[in-house]
A protein has these predicted regions:
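Targeting-peptide/extracellular-domain and disordered-appendage signature
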Residues: 13-14
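Extracytoplasmic
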Residues: 5-8, 18-48, 52-78
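Pro/Ala/Gly-rich low-complexity, hydrophilic intrinsically disordered segments
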Residues: 1-2
Length: 78
């Protein structure tokens, strides 16, 4: 019986800010450029712009593409 290899999942976080307006603008700009990102609600006093949960390789590629477009992004383990 074949066992399914568990792939490592990551979240791409583009930006954290205390300004909801700033976070929404960043999410909007990234969406215009074709990135699947969304504005997260305020967590611990910070607004977050994140992408969905991705396989590690996909997340790393997204961070590279975001960097090419001028966005700073971090990989978060989950």
């Amino acid at each position: 019986m074949a066992t399914k290899k568990k792939t490592e999942k990551k979240v791409v976080e583009i930006f954290s800010t205390q300004s909801p307006n700033e976070a929404e603008q960043i999410a909007f700009q990234a969406q215009i450029k074709g990135f699947d990102v969304h504005f997260n609600a305020i967590v611990g006093g910070y607004c977050k712009v994140r992408s969905a949960v991705l396989d590690k390789e996909d997340a790393e590629q997204m961070v590279e593409k975001l960097a090419e477009e001028g966005f700073t992004a971090n990989l978060l383990s989950i």
